[in-house]
From Swiss-Prot:
Protein induction: Expressed constitutively.
GO cellular component: endoplasmic reticulum; endoplasmic reticulum membrane; mitochondrial membrane; plasma membrane
UniProt keywords, alphabetically: Cell membrane, Endoplasmic reticulum, Membrane, Mitochondrion, Transmembrane, Transmembrane helix
Protein's UniProt name: Membrane-bound O-acyltransferase GUP1
Originating species: Saccharomyces cerevisiae (strain ATCC 204508 / S288c)
Gene: GUP1
One GO MF term attached to the UniProt entry: O-acyltransferase activity
General remark: Present with 672 molecules/cell in log phase SD medium.
Gene disruption: observed consequences: Results in an increase in triglyceride (TG) synthesis with a concomitant decrease in phospholipid (PL) synthesis and exhibits an altered plasma membrane lipid composition. Shows defects in cell wall assembly and stability and abnormal cell wall morphology. Deficient in GPI anchor remodeling, mutant cells only contain the primary, unremodeled phosphatidylinositol (PI) and are unable to attach remodeled PI or ceramides to the anchor. Defective in sterol lipid distribution.
Cross-referenced InterPro entries: MB_O-acyltransferase (IPR051085), MBOAT_fam (IPR004299)
Amino acid sequence: MSLISILSPLITSEGLDSRIKPSPKKDASTTTKPSLWKTTEFKFYYIAFLVVVPLMFYAGLQASSPENPNYARYERLLSQGWLFGRKVDNSDSQYRFFRDNFALLSVLMLVHTSIKRIVLYSTNITKLRFDLIFGLIFLVAAHGVNSIRILAHMLILYAIAHVLKNFRRIATISIWIYGISTLFINDNFRAYPFGNICSFLSPLDHWYRGIIPRWDVFFNFTLLRVLSYNLDFLERWENLQKKKSPSYESKEAKSAILLNERARLTAAHPIQDYSLMNYIAYVTYTPLFIAGPIITFNDYVYQSKHTLPSINFKFIFYYAVRFVIALLSMEFILHFLHVVAISKTKAWENDTPFQISMIGLFNLNIIWLKLLIPWRLFRLWALLDGIDTPENMIRCVDNNYSSLAFWRAWHRSYNKWVVRYIYIPLGGSKNRVLTSLAVFSFVAIWHDIELKLLLWGWLIVLFLLPEIFATQIFSHYTDAVWYRHVCAVGAVFNIWVMMIANLFGFCLGSDGTKKLLSDMFCTVSGFKFVILASVSLFIAVQIMFEIREEEKRHGIYLKC
């Protein structure tokens, strides 16, 4: 066995998700170009990488150094670390919650999977029944008496779907209206006293509130599963009335579904599988309850009855190794680059534009990692339990040049959910602007109930339009010698806009972004930095292009 074959599952997208596999299709979209890896042009790019990347880390280290005059301003946010005697930047509240509870989550993962295997082996209890019982126990342990609020929303939506099942369009609209309204209800009444609803419920106000009292924070993920069940049920009920038979009755069809995610999404289960018990088991499924990744109800039920080929030791082992690598990468960054604390205290006075930009860039990498690591832990947990969900992030945050592709690769299971339940039902590419507005409006509201986020969603649609139009215009010149380089120039502009927008929203804020832009365009050193950074981005984009071409040469056609 060669070294390449051993390392391949650790570096390829196929090693992340069994859904990504070589495709036999041959058409204009799959045509590949000769490899550029060994050309003189790319040898120059390799030299540039060897010079620029270390300089980027060095700039971040300088900004985080105890010798930096700004160090005293953010030192109070640092904690005692465990790597090389350095302090760790544990100031991000979201990742701190995960990091501080990592041991507890790991123990829970081992306990859950061990108990489940013992119970399934020694009793006649099915996977779905075990998930129901354990899920309810976990729900109460996590949210205490607030579990009643979650169950109330679940039951109301269940009732709407089943009462109006013979009127699919009315039922669907009603489900969406109430589903979205739950986000507003929770935002305004998450701690509304039970006693105010009915006096005899007042004792509930003094009961156990759970390990996670803020139940509403994680309800957004619960809502996606609740909507998935009810929409899948309505689709199945309508097909049943039209006498459509189950799609996996024959052995041939069953084999196809085992290998085809798209078929599993619409797998026509017996109507008895859409029971209240299975509904609760799915919504409260412990490994994915807190934050996903998202799997549809149809897919979950199918995988609970049939083991997919991806549930094997080799795939799960390599996935676990990739998780550990991501976890340790985050630890090294937090110990050596204190960029989160710097951003929180705005401790960048007299730093160069290059240093400030690296503070922002590594902040974006931390945001990516703080989402990727929990998602991979929960997906690993589900894999150990026999459920294969979509991988949420198949591209590094630094390996993106397209806004559209970035959206598809970032929170991928959520994107798949949105495509299935919003984008396609509203017409898909036939009404691209309208469906995009609907999609990003829901995405904005789902993330947080704020007008600025709704405006952010609409602005994203406006920002996507130039890329969509430019792609359509220049797609006729794909064979031209200059095409790749013109695309790279456009991609550099795209990256600048995406970086500045994300730095403004998530890292530097208005003050930091204004200072960065002022230093970049109003000083000689800043202008030099912009030129050199743009050249570096141009080189990076060329590498990104070739990575995707190499994937195509191996039959991998990703849209991101």
